[in-house]
Amino acid sequence: TQPPLKGRLATKHYRSTKNIYMEVFDQLINDNKLKTLRYEKEGVDFAKIINPEKIECLEIAFCSLTSLFGIACLSNLRRISLYYCRFLQDISSIGDLQMLENITLYSLPQVKKHFKIPELINLVALSYTRVGGIETIRGIEELPKLIYLGLSQVKVKDNDYSPILQSKSLERVFWCGSPFKVPALKELRKLRPDIVIGGNLYNEIYFAKKNKSNDNK
């Protein structure tokens, strides 16, 4: 029998069936060979991790932690995924992880303190789904490698979508619900036709556009 998932190392990427759009985008931004540490329905203590510098991917699901204090020990982390952590309030420590390329946040309704986006200069993908306390997305326009932004069933409090307009690297914005007030979506599509903006139905459009671009190189 397999041992319990008590902070075990794994090489197989955990895929959330609830996060379909990230599944589709996986083929572009994810590396399933990353050395992964996963916690599920258990206590999380970063101080007890052996050889934390070797961990490249962290996945935490259904855990009752309230903050990510101590996570800075994972200095080579490239990907972090947080799912259904209903008591998590402070994720500001993510900003200490300078190697991060991919952040997936899913069903974190109690978050009040967020990380500073501009600090994560290696970020390629940033995804919010049902996450609380999003004051702003300002800073994404400063990220030179960011190609994917996910805004699903969230509200951005300052209602400022200009960072999307200003970004020079964004290719795809997953948009579900109304993260900004009307007519944000209409305006964005008008002013940035080069960015594919929309829900799951737009995945096919994005990949067709991507393939055409590659064929022309």
Could you tell me what each predicted segment is?
Residues 1-66, 73-89, 96-183, 189-217:
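Concave beta-strand-loop units of leucine-rich repeat
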